[in-house]
UniProtKB/Swiss-Prot annotation:
The lineage of its organism: Bacteria, Pseudomonadati, Pseudomonadota, Gammaproteobacteria, Alteromonadales. Comprises two domains: an N-terminal domain containing the nucleotidyltransferase activity and a C-terminal HD domain associated with both phosphodiesterase and phosphatase activities. CTP binds at G8, R11, R91, R137, R140. It comes from Pseudoalteromonas atlantica (strain T6c / ATCC BAA-1087). Monomer. Can also form homodimers and oligomers. Magnesium is required for nucleotidyltransferase activity. The gene is cca. GO terms for biological process: RNA repair; tRNA 3'-terminal CCA addition. This is Multifunctional CCA protein. Mg(2+) binds at D21, D23. The keyword Hydrolase applies.
Length: 405
C-alpha cells in the first residue's frame, strides 16, 4: 500500500502557490484495507475516504471507462492492480497529472513539469474528450492561471471544440456547470473563463443570453469598445477591483443581457434594455440554478444601473422611489453591492478604467440622509394609517433634496 500526494496540491507546490486542499491517491489497497485503518468512506461514484485525523481525502487508484453520457457516465476500476501511472493517465491536464511520494520525489509520466515551466495547459490523453465537464474545468484553470502567463495548448482547444460539437455539454447537470462558473467568477481574471468557453463554442450551450451579445454595437461616445460582449467582459474584469463577492461579479457579468433583445434597426441605441434584461437574466438563472442572492442582485443591476449612471440628473423624488424599489431600508448591504457593480460597469469601458465615478457615493449619501428620517416622530405627531407612509416619503424626499442642492 503506497500513498501519494496528487493533482492540484503538487501543481501549486511547484508553482509556489498556497496549497489549499491536499488530495491523496492510494495504490495497492482495497476498500477493506482503508476501513480497517480507520478511514471513513464518503465517495458514492468511486471509493474516496476521509483520513481519521486530518479529514483529507484519500482515493483508491482507479481507471475509468466511458459507458454513458455526461460527467457521471463512467465505470471505475479500483482494484489493487491499478498502478499510479494508470491513475494519473485518466486526469485532465498534464499539470494536474503529477504525484509526490513521502520523500518529496515527483512522479511525472506525462511531462507536467515541462508544461508548468512553459506555462501550458495541455490534456493528458485523448480520453480528455470523454468527460464534457473538462471543457469548463480547463476554462476555469485558464482563468486562474492567466496571471501566471498560462495559455491552453492548441491541440487541447481542438478537443474542447470537439466536445462542444458532439453535444455532450448539454448532458452536464446545471449544478456542475454553476459550481465551475462560480469558482471561475471568484478568480482574479474571471473574464478568461467566459472568453475561453466562447472560443470553443461552449458559451452558447449554457450561456446563450450572454453569447449573443458579441457583435451588438453600443454608441461609440459612451462605449469606445463598441461591442456589447467585449463591454461585458470589461465590466466583469473591473468587478474584481471593486468586490470579492460572487453576487457582485455575477451582476456585473449579466447586467446588459437586455441589449441582446434590442431590435437591430434600433442599434446602437438600447432604450429600455434595463427592464428588457429581466427576462433573460431570470431564464439564465433558472437554467443554471443560480443562488437567489446572485439572481436578485443581477435583476436589480439590470433594472437600475442607468439610474445610478444618471444620478446627478435625478430629482429627489425619483431617487427616493429608486431607494424604495431597491428595498434599501431592509437590505442596505445589497444596495451597497449594487453601487459596486455600477462602478464596475462605468469603468468597464475603453478609456474609462481610471476615471472617478462619484455617482455611487452621491446615491449612497442620499440614502444616508433619507435614513435619518425618524418614523416614530411622524407617528408621535399624530399621523395615522396611509398618512404615515405619505409623510415618511415627503420627509425623505426633503432630506434627499438637501443633498441634491
Amino acid at each position: 500500500m503506497q500513498v501519494y500526494l496528487v493533482g492540484g496540491a503538487v501543481r501549486d507546490k511547484l508553482l509556489e502557490r498556497p496549497v489549499k486542499d491536499k488530495d491523496w491517491v492510494v495504490v495497492g489497497a482495497s476498500e477493506a484495507d482503508m476501513l480497517a485503518k480507520g478511514f471513513q468512506q464518503v465517495g458514492k461514484d468511486f471509493p474516496v475516504f476521509l483520513h481519521p485525523k486530518t479529514q483529507q481525502e484519500y482515493a483508491l487508484a482507479r481507471t475509468e471507462r466511458k459507458i454513458g453520457q455526461g460527467y457521471a457516465g463512467f465505470e471505475c476500476d479500483t482494484s489493487t492492480n491499478v498502478t499510479l501511472e494508470q491513475d494519473l493517465l485518466r486526469r485532465d491536464l498534464t499539470v494536474n497529472a503529477m504525484a509526490m511520494d513521502d520523500n518529496g520525489n515527483i512522479i511525472d509520466p506525462f511531462n507536467g513539469q515541462k508544461d508548468l515551466r512553459n506555462r501550458v495547459l495541455r490534456h493528458v490523453s485523448d480520453a480528455f474528450e470523454e468527460d464534457p465537464l473538462r471543457v469548463l474545468r480547463v476554462a476555469r484553470f485558464a482563468a486562474r492561471y492567466a496571471s501566471y502567463g498560462f495559455s491552453i495548448a492548441d491541440e487541447t482547444k481542438t478537443l474542447m471544440a470537439n466536445i462542444t460539437q458532439s453535444g455532450e455539454l448539454s448532458h452536464l447537470s446545471a449544478e456542475r456547470v454553476w459550481v465551475e462558473t462560480a469558482k471561475s467568477l471568484l478568480e482574479d481574471t474571471p473574464q478568461i473563463y467566459f472568453e475561453t468557453l466562447r472560443e470553443c463554442g461552449a458559451l452558447k450551450v449554457w450561456f446563450a443570453e450572454l453569447d449573443c451579445l458579441w457583435g451588438i454595437p453600443n454608441p461609440a461616445k459612451w462605449h469606445p469598445e463598441i461591442d456589447t460582449g467585449i463591454h461585458s467582459m470589461m465590466v466583469l474584469e473591473q468587478s474584481v477591483r471593486v468586490s470579492h463577492k460572487l453576487s457582485v461579479r455575477f451582476a456585473a457579468l449579466v447586467h446588459d443581457l437586455g441589449k441582446g433583445l434590442t431590435p437591430p434597426e434600433e442599434w446602437p441605441s438600447h432604450r429600455g434594455h434595463e427592464k428588457r434584461g429581466l427576462v433573460p437574466i431570470n431564464t439564465l438563472c433558472e437554467r443554471l440554478k443560480v443562488p437567489n442572492d446572485c439572481r436578485d442582485l443581477a435583476l436589480l443591476m439590470s433594472e437600475f444601473h442607468s439610474h445610478v449612471h444618471h444620478a446627478f440628473k435625478l430629482k429627489a423624488a425619483t431617487i427616493n422611489d429608486f431607494l424604495d424599489k431597491c428595498d434599501v431600508w431592509r437590505k442596505p448591504e445589497r444596495f451597497a453591492d449594487l453601487l459596486l457593480a455600477c462602478t464596475a460597469d462605468a469603468k468597464g469601458r475603453t478609456g474609462f478604467e481610471e476615471r472617478p465615478y462619484p455617482n455611487a457615493d452621491y446615491i449612497w449619501q442620499a440614502y444616508l440622509l433619507a435614513k435619518e428620517v425618524n418614523v416614530q416622530e411622524i407617528v408621535q405627531a399624530g399621523y395615522k394609517g396611509a398618512e404615515i407612509k405619505q409623510q415618511l416619503r415627503q420627509k425623505r424626499i426633503h432630506a434627499i433634496a438637501t443633498n441634491v442642492a
